[in-house]
Every structure is written in structure tokens, then in C-alpha cells.
Curated annotation (Swiss-Prot):
Record's protein name: Keratin-associated protein 29-1
Pfam families from the UniProt entry: Keratin_B2_2
Entry-linked InterPro entries: KAP (IPR002494), Keratin_matx (IPR007659)
GO function terms (MF aspect): structural molecule activity
Keywords, alphabetical: Keratin, Repeat
Gene Ontology cellular component annotations, sorted alphabetically: cytosol; keratin filament
Repeat (Sequence) residue spans along the chain: 5-9, 115-119, 120-124, 150-154, 240-244, 276-280, 307-311
Family: Belongs to the KRTAP type 10 family.
Record has Lipid biosynthesis as a keyword: no
Taxonomy, superkingdom: Eukaryota
Residue segments, region 7 X 5 AA repeats of C-C-X(3): 5-311
Length: 341
């Protein structure tokens, strides 16, 4: 296998079987495992068509002829090929004559242990790669946060026994760089925790190390706080989580499909429970005071009442002029103010 795995020089390996996993205590049994040639590298799973027939639109580096049918219990045919991501020139080394990888595809390589005191590329699916100075410790590079950036040869084995599921995010103000052995953590600058406590919240992005096909005929519920999920469908029965602002993720049944997490492009800010204001229910009258159906339906953050417009075009509460049409409150900071329609 050639070491040049950057875009434009991709190499595919023959398809290997996908095995349905069954959750047991402490992990998964019969996980999807990559062949030995996939070890110590970063890999990108390329799923083929359900019929596993060669297609004209096959991804770059996916040899249609190597896509062989693989039968899962009670499902249609599923096959895949391993396509390596950049696995060689992950570190910018001066004076070696080697051209560095493209910034957008650079990945730390477990076989590289000479990158100490050099700049290692931190590639993440959500943003442009950034290079950070590394500190040499026992032949491996350690990032400032303590996570390994460059591992010694043989220390990283991206097998399914190590990566069985995608972890949830944790709202901790920690920024860590990418590692071949662990998911990539990206900081969402506009992301706020749903609990409204104010600390910065990160979103999880998953490295294409080892994909797990969950059991068929079962519900898969994996909420990701502060980030909508992106579903990629395959061939099983499960549920797809559809998060919404200010609400926990809502799971919707998707017949005859199952999904695996893919990297999400951007971190979107969810609606914080501190400043989710709901409009009051007001009745427009021709004259006199406006009547409202019960107390204003605001949360506990002290949202002020909106402008209940009367037919005379005045607001009895504030005395300011209002248009004789319905006013909808808009949420600004932690209070609502009237908006003229």
C-alpha cells in the first residue's frame, strides 16, 4: 500500500464484511472490524449501493469492482471499501524535501514519531485545518490539552473494539486537537448550553475511523447537544433523531433505514432556555383596555409583556403609539420587546 494517501492519490482496498452488532453490557459484540491493512491509518468508509453493483458515480478512490455483496440478517446487501485519508505527511517537516499534505485533508499519522518540535496538522471536518506547536514527550507529540496528536507506531489501532459508538458532547470549556484514536472536538463559538448556565459548549465531530452498524429492528437514540444531527441512511430499521431548538431531540421513525453519524459542517446555536420568549395571547378590541387570555406565557427570565394593540392604535400599558394591527414580541437578550408589524 502506498503511503501517498492525499486526495488525487487515493488507494482503495477490497470490501470486507459488515457485521450486525448487538449491544451487551460493557460494549458491543460482533463489531464491524477493518482489515489489518487499515491499521495505523486514518480511514474513510465509502458505502456502496444496496445492490453492490458498480456505479458510474462511485466516489473517488472507490473501486467499483471491489465492492462485493455482503448480506446482513434480514437486510439487503451492504458493502464498503476502505479509503485512506492523508496518512503520511501529517507533520510539516523542514529540510526533508517532502511536500506537506493539503491543509484540508491533513491527518496525524500514528507511524510518524519524528514530528516532535514541529507543527502538526489538526484537520477537522467542521473548519479549516490549523497547525499548532507540539511538545516532545517520550517520542510522541502532546497537545496543550493533554490529548495525543501524533502517536508512536502501532499505538493506534482504529478497530471496532476501541470505537463502538459516538460519544455525546460534554459542555466543558476545553479545546482539544484531533487525534487518530479519538473523535475530533470542535468548539462552537456561538454554541450555548441548553441549560443556560453560560459556559461554552462544544459540538462533537466524528472521525471516519470505524463505523458501527447498529442492530436492525431497534431504536437508535443518540442526542448531540448544541448541534443538529446529520443522518446518512443505509439499510435497516431504526429511528432518526431530529433535534429542534429549545427542545430535546425528537426521534422520528424511518422505515427500512438505519444511519451512522457523519461530520456536521457548522455549529449552530440552539435557543437557550434563558431567552426563549413566547408571545402572550391578546385580543384586539375597538376601545378600552385590551383583554388577555390568562397570564402572559413567558418563562421565568422576566420577559416583559408585549404591546397589546387596541383598535385605537394606542398601548394602554406604555402610552406609546401602536399601529392598529397585531404586534408580535421579539426576543432580545433576556426580555421581549414589542415589534410593530
Amino acid at each position: 500500500m502506498a503511503d501517498g494517501c492525499c486526495p488525487g492519490n487515493t488507494t482503495a482496498i477490497p470490501a470486507v464484511p459488515t457485521i450486525t452488532t448487538y449491544p451487551v453490557k460493557g460494549g458491543f459484540r460482533h463489531a464491524l472490524c477493518l482489515p489489518s491493512s487499515c491499521h495505523s491509518r486514518m480511514w474513510q468508509l465509502v458505502t456502496c449501493q444496496e445492490s453492490c453493483q458498480p456505479s458510474i458515480g462511485a466516489p473517488s478512490g472507490c473501486d467499483p469492482a471491489s465492492c462485493q455483496p455482503t448480506r446482513l440478517p434480514a437486510t439487503s446487501c451492504v458493502g464498503f471499501v476502505c479509503q485512506p485519508m492523508c496518512s503520511h505527511a501529517a507533520c510539516y517537516q523542514s529540510g526533508t524535501g517532502q511536500s506537506p499534505c493539503l491543509v484540508s485533508s491533513c491527518q496525524p499519522s500514528c507511524s510518524e514519531s519524528t514530528c516532535c518540535q514541529e507543527k502538526c496538522c489538526d484537520a477537522s471536518p467542521c473548519q479549516q485545518s490549523s497547525c499548532q506547536e507540539s511538545v516532545c514527550m517520550s517520542g510522541s507529540c502532546q497537545a496543550a490539552c493533554g490529548q495525543s496528536v501524533c502517536c508512536d507506531a502501532g499505538s493506534c489501532q482504529p478497530s471496532c473494539s476501541e470505537v463502538t459508538s459516538c460519544p455525546e458532547t460534554s459542555c466543558l470549556p476545553t479545546i482539544c486537537t484531533a487525534s487518530p484514536c479519538q473523535p475530533t472536538w470542535c468548539q462552537g463559538s456561538s454554541c450555548q448550553p441548553v441549560s443556560g448556565e453560560g459556559q461554552p459548549c462544544k459540538s462533537t465531530y466524528y472521525q471516519p475511523i470505524c463505523y458501527i452498524f447498529k442492530p436492525c429492528q431497534s431504536a437508535l437514540y443518540m442526542p448531540v447537544p448544541c448541534q443538529p444531527s446529520t443522518c446518512v441512511f443505509s439499510s435497516c430499521n431504526t429511528t432518526c433523531c431530529v433535534p429542534s431548538h429549545c427542545q430535546p431531540p425528537h426521534c422520528q421513525l424511518v422505515p427500512s433505514t438505519c444511519f451512522i453519524y457523519q461530520p456536521v459542517a457548522n455549529c449552530q446555536a440552539p435557543c437557550s432556555t434563558k431567552n426563549c420568549c413566547k408571545p402572550a395571547s391578546c385580543d384586539t378590541v375597538i376601545s378600552g383596555q385590551p383583554t388577555c387570555d390568562g397570564p402572559p406565557s413567558y418563562n421565568q427570565s422576566g420577559c416583559k409583556s408585549a404591546c397589546c394593540v387596541t383598535g385605537l392604535g394606542t398601548s394602554p400599558s406604555s402610552g406609546s403609539n401602536c399601529l392598529p394591527t397585531s404586534c408580535q414580541p421579539s426576543c432580545e437578550s433576556s426580555f421581549c420587546k414589542a415589534t410593530l408589524c
